[in-house]
Amino acid sequence: MWSCPQKYEREVEDVNSRLSKLEGYLEDKEAKITLSEFLRNNLYFTTYLLSGIKLAPYQEITLRALFNRNFSMCVWGRGCGKSFIAAVYCFLQCVFEPNTKILIAGPTFRTARFIFNNIEKIVETREAVLLAQAFGAKIKRNDQYEWRINGGTITAIPLSGEKIRGFRANVLVLDEFMLLPEDIIKNVLMPFLVAPQDMTRRMRIKEVEDELIQQGAIEEKDRTKFENTSKMIALSSASYTFENLYKTYQDWINKIQDKESKLEAKYFVSQLGYEALPKE
């Protein structure tokens, strides 16, 4: 069952229909923009093109949600593919959004490495020739894995020691969320998301708008409103109601269902048991 509150409902353009009506010759820049728009709106095709992976419908729907929401939680049963779908999301996010910094964290380094290793397995397959060309240098240390891709990085770290406090990220992927202490999430992990991905561009726009306001050309209310693009993805199996996972789950559900809420951030919550998995 899928549920979407009215405040999240919006008119969705049929991009494929519009693109199918294009005729004639496209200039190089326009062709690139058109292709990227098509690939972004057809995640099944894009994933298959880059990696040879054929997504199940529930996996494609989940990927779309991860792209369109700031805070996402997948409470899935064992063997339902949480780490796999996170690995696919990581490389797609970096392909579509250059300079993205993704931080994968877990209660142990072994947990964090699992998603990173999934990405490696996908990239090293014979079908992932195109995807492999997007990746660059790879660094593996005892307490940190890092892989450069499209101007950004995918980094896996353990949640131990003071070292993690120095990291910054646009996307935070937390595996085994139920095992992470609440104070670590609030005081250590959430501050990772403070740096906008396009800080340089935002500063330039602010400087231009400061001058325009001084000249009286625009007013303070006319300033550009930047969309919040930071993301946190929580992956976990189900836990007891007295644990922080359930508390966070209820908090996000309430924010989704609250009709009066005017929060800038958007939320997505998904539950999946092994009985609901497709047979093939």
Predicted regions and their residues:
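Phosphate/NTP-binding elements of NTP-utilizing enzymes
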Residues: 2-280
